[in-house]
């Protein structure tokens, strides 16, 4: 198995564990109760050829064990928002990045910008989960098979 395949298998196993606690049907219903998604298109399209910035809340990376200073992801997102990004990306993958859906909740509650959930999405469950936690956008990896949403 490649390292990417291992990461995908880990992401699937983690999603399956969460699904055993909160069934897909209940999560799907929760995702429908979230206020409408904020469109990122207006902020991504610029007429002045300026670079569009997507700020990222991330606790760690595979290279750096700890990105100190992310004690409050919501507060960090507020600082980012003051700089005028088009969106805020929140790394939610718990494995090597120490992200979480709680980080997504905190950022969603803190800013009125489009919020992107950044995780290795391998199941439809994760799509509904991200939306239920307030994500407006979702990062999908082109190396994975297309998801069929249920």
Segments (PLM) and residue ranges:
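A short hydrophobic/small-residue beta-strand
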Residues: 87, 137-138
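Active-site-proximal glycine-rich helix-loop-beta segment
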Residues: 84, 134-135
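Structural loop-to-beta junction motif characteristic of Rossmann-like glycosyltransferase folds
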Residues: 113, 135-136
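Active-site-adjacent beta->alpha loops and helix N-cap segments on the catalytic face
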Residues: 92-111, 120-128, 139-150
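Conserved N-terminal beta1-alpha1 strand-loop-helix module at the mouth
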Residues: 1-115
């Amino acid at each position: 198995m490649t390292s990417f395949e291992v990461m995908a298998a880990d992401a699937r196993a983690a999603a399956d564990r969460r699904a055993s606690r909160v069934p897909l049907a209940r999560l799907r219903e929760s995702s429908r109760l979230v206020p409408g998604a904020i469109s990122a298109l207006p902020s991504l399209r610029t007429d002045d050829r300026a670079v569009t910035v997507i700020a990222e809340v991330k606790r760690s990376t595979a290279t750096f064990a700890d990105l100190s200073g992310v004690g409050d992801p919501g507060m960090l997102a507020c600082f980012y928002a003051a700089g005028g990004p088009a969106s805020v990306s929140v790394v939610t993958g718990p494995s090597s990045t120490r992200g979480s859906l709680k980080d997504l909740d905190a950022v969603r509650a803190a800013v009125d910008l489009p919020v992107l959930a950044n995780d290795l999405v391998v199941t439809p469950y994760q799509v509904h989960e991200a939306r239920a936690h307030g994500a407006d956008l979702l990062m999908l990896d082109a190396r994975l098979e297309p998801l069929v949403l249920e």
